[in-house]
Amino acid sequence: MLKMGVVLFVFLVLFPLATLQLDADQPVERYAENKQLVSPYERRQIILHALGQRQCCDWQWCDGACDCCA
């Protein structure tokens, strides 16, 4: 009888709770899909801003003092 109670608890309480948590991921996925439409230049600017780098040097003139973006 105890085993049946545990099985019922798992399927009636824990399983629905686990499936409801999956719904919370949808806004993040939708945001990621919208970000795929950003041009490569805009994407690079977003990444550089997040990393704290404001300017890119030309790869031909790059020395050890700058971070190249190309």
From Swiss-Prot:
InterPro entries in alphabetical order:
Conotoxin
> What is this protein called in UniProt?
Conotoxin TsMLKM-011
Report one GO cellular component.
extracellular region
Name the protein family.
Belongs to the conotoxin M superfamily.
Query: Which cystines does this chain contain?
Result: 56-66, 57-68, 62-69
Which compartments is it annotated to reside in? Secreted
Quick check: keyword Transmembrane in the entry? no
Tissue expression, per UniProt? Expressed by the venom duct.
An MF annotation (GO) of this entry: toxin activity
Q: What is its main location?
A: secreted
What is recorded about the domains? The cysteine framework is III (CC-C-C-CC).
Keywords of the record, alphabetical order, are:
Disulfide bond, Secreted, Signal, Toxin
Please state the span of the N-terminal signal peptide per the UniProt entry: 1-24
Instruction: Provide the residue ranges of the propeptide in this protein.
Output: 25-54
